[in-house]
């Protein structure tokens, strides 16, 4: 058996497309909702704890909607964690231009000037960490396997605080 349940939160058509390529495991539950439709929070069992990972999700949402989600998540899952990565406004503007150049323009309204501001979005936030270097998650041996141009790029983004991971506990 499995020690955890994985909830796939996404739009119904995206969930269907995912299942064409990746079979659903026995411990997975699909939640066909938008992240901003807080009804999905009532479908998640928090009995064993909840860790929500939102890679690449918040870029496309307005700040007030993410702030409301952070607060609702914190209220629904005391002791839970929410982890996401994002970019500084300057880097995100560059990302928008890059995406538009390749034919898929998309607005990225989640431009938070202060990476520490989201900890104020909910009274339920108990701890809050920001990591500005994605290589911090790797051992020295693993870092050596990353091509040098990428290590340099990650170092640059760390210096300008251009991309970062937020890890908040409730």
Give the predicted meaning of each segment.
Residues 1-170:
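Alpha-helical subdomain
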């Amino acid at each position: 058996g499995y020690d955890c349940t994985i909830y796939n939160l996404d739009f119904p058509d995206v969930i269907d497309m995912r299942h064409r390529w990746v079979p659903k495991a026995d411990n997975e539950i699909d939640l066909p909702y938008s992240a901003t439709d807080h009804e999905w929070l009532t479908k998640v069992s928090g009995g064993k704890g909840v860790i929500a990972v939102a890679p690449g999700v918040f870029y496309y949402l307005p700040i007030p909607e993410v702030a409301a989600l952070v607060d609702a998540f914190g209220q629904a899952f005391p002791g839970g964690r929410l982890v996401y990565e994002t970019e500084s406004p300057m880097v995100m503007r560059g990302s928008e231009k890059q995406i538009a150049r390749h034919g898929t323009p998309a607005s990225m309204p989640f431009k938070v000037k202060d990476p520490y501001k989201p900890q104020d979005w909910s009274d339920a936030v108990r701890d809050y960490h920001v990591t500005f270097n994605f290589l911090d998650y790797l051992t020295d041996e693993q870092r050596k396997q990353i091509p040098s141009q990428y290590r340099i790029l990650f170092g640059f983004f760390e210096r300008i605080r251009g991309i970062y991971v937020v890890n908040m506990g409730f």
